[in-house]
């Protein structure tokens, strides 16, 4: 193993549930043979982590220090003896399990180098990779009507990619600031999703009773899934990009059958696909084809991470993505 410097302790966030998180010191771990240790610059706060912060009976508390952070980026400071494709000092994005911390260990195969062209940019690789993977599995082509339900970080970037592919994006959100962001990213139609029946009528005014060729559900709630089913046309593709974690869902299978829908769970779990998505996202950002910068709306010091989660829970006007400063 090669090590840059010698450090005895590091700092991490410890989640105890019921909106309680504290700062703890942890011993520095050494990477195994095919691992790297990264000195983190930052980590995105993922909406899927909100229930962990709020507290749920099915979670076991306290979480491991740094968990469930998984959107980290920073510089490699130690490598395992079988890692030959990466070097100490490389700036990387990664998928790792405990990135709400100053340091985390990642598998070498879950790490992507960040080019020098993005030296001054935050790069939360995991959600950026999710966007690209969702887009790939959505099979978007020019001229399609694409309804995107939920314009958060994922929904806004998916809007950009769909518009770039020549699709006509119908953006649906409860928040006016989210619809404004969708318009900035190229959406051709903006619809408030305060009432499901009203939203469905407005969409059908645009694309007719035949419905949309593609519907991307990016909320993770039952009502959004119900609306997605109503908007999808015959032989359409309904793409589930929202993270559903608070219990089983019910769907209108008769409608799905009658419409002949292709239903896609767009969350990749194959590590190789995770990495592929991150690599492609970083390339798109590096060339200017994708710009997430307007969505990085809040930066929070690690010691104040609870503030970031309160913002995520309340979603003040203009909020899209909070990044934790892990330095």
Range-by-range predicted roles:
Residues 200-201, 205, 209, 247-297, ...:
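C-terminal substrate-binding/catalytic core of Rossmann-like NAD(P)-dependent dehydrogenases/reductases
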Residues 231-248, 264:
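ADP-ribose/adenylate-binding Rossmann-like module
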Residues 78, 92-149:
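NAD(P)H dinucleotide-binding glycine-rich loop of Rossmann-like/cofactor-binding domains
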Residues 2-8, 226-229, 234, 276-327:
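C-terminal hydrophobic helical "lid"/dimerization subdomain
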Residues 148, 163-227:
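Adenosine-nucleotide cofactor-binding segment
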Residues 144-163:
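Glycine-rich adenosine-cofactor-binding loop
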Residues 27-44, 56-98, 117:
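Glycine-rich beta-strand-centered segment in the early N-terminal region that forms part
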């Amino acid at each position: 193993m090669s090590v840059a410097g010698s450090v005895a302790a590091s700092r991490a966030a410890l989640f105890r549930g019921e909106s309680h998180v504290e700062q703890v010191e942890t011993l520095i771990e050494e990477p195994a043979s095919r691992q790297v240790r990264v000195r983190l610059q930052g980590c995105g706060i993922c909406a899927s982590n909100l229930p962990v912060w709020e507290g749920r009976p099915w979670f076991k508390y306290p979480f491991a220090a740094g968990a469930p952070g998984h959107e980290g980026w920073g510089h490699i400071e130690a490598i395992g003896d079988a890692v030959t494709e990466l070097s100490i000092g490389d700036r990387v994005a990664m998928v790792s399990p405990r990135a709400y911390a100053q340091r985390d260990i990642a598998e070498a195969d879950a790490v992507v180098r960040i080019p020098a062209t993005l030296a001054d940019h935050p790069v939360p690789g995991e959600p950026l990779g999710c966007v690209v993977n969702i887009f790939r599995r959505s099979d978007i082509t020019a001229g399609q009507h694409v309804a995107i339900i939920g314009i958060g970080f994922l929904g806004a970037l998916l809007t950009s990619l769909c518009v770039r592919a020549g699709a006509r994006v119908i953006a649906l959100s409860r928040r006016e600031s989210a619809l404004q962001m969708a318009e900035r990213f190229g959406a051709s139609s903006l619809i408030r999703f305060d009432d499901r029946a009203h939203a469905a009528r407005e969409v059908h005014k645009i694309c007719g009773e035949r419905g949309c060729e593609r519907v991307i559900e990016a909320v993770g709630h039952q009502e959004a899934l119900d609306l997605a089913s109503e908007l999808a046309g015959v032989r359409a593709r309904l793409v589930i990009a929202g993270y559903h974690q608070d219990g089983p869902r019910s769907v209108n299978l008769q409608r799905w059958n009658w419409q002949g829908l292709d239903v896609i769970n767009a969350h990749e779990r194959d590590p190789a696909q995770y990495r592929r998505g991150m690599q492609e996202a970083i390339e798109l950002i590096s060339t200017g084809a994708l710009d997430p910068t307007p969505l990085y709306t809040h930066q929070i010091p690690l010691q104040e991470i609870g503030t970031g989660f309160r913002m995520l829970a309340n979603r003040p006007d203009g909020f899209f993505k909070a990044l934790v400063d892990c330095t």
